[in-house]
Amino acid sequence: MTRVVVLGGSGFLGSHVADALKRRGYEVHACSRRTGIDASQEQALTAYLQRVNPHILVHCAAHVGGIAYNAKCPVAIFEDNLLLGYAVVRAACRAGIKKLVNIMPNCTYPGDLDLYSEPMWWDGPMHSTVLTYGMPRKALWVHAWACQQEYGLESIHLVLPNLYGPRDHFDAVRSHALGALIHKIVEARQAETKSVEIWGTGGAVREWMYVEDAAEGIVLATECYNNIEILNLGSGKGCSIRELAGMIRELAGWDGEFIYDATKPDG
């Protein structure tokens, strides 16, 4: 039976990836800080991987939040993800992992793009609001590429759109746009508040993917894709923040109005 370690296996995406792998018959070891494994500690992670001896390592761990959180904690986000990525690639090499599957955010694309196509990944800088998160994740790809050249490390790098679904975060600061909108609108309905403030113009278009679909796509790519060049997972269809807010308002049964703060960045 093929053994797989899922880093961040207690988190939103990682827990669903672990579930999807189990359904396909893999022997799955889901690890995270909750299970006593800090993946940013190279020596401890290497020792764990050498003990479990997995064939495949799926990296879903990250220190991540929404735009407001990125603005509040840029140093911690940058340093934590840089150390995490470095430790994961080094440990994968030292433990003799046969395949590293790295999950990438789509904020690693140039910030001025409306459509994300793999050949455009290196065509410009990331948006400043996500730079401290996106840059360490992009550096992980470079590190993995270097280790392929020197040590023969095999890795794939899958770029995902924004995710939603069971086990998501819904606090106003740490969550991404969809989770934050749900939190604000449901809270407004419960408090009988007549308006909700939304950052940006509402015109920004974002692609969304149900987390269980993302997990199935990751498993399929793990089985079928073997190129270090990035691969997008998604439908290629987007939805504006304004449209999204309207759908949530209707489903929540709230009849208030939205106040868009154009002085803030679009979510």
Which residues make up each language-model segment?
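NAD(P)H-binding glycine-rich loop region in Rossmannoid oxidoreductase-like domains
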Residues: E42-N81, R94
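C-terminal substrate-binding subdomain of Rossmann-fold SDR/epimerase-dehydratase oxidoreductases
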Residues: H16-R23, E187-G267
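Flexible, glycine-rich beta-alpha linker
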Residues: T108-P110, T132, I156-A180, A204-V205
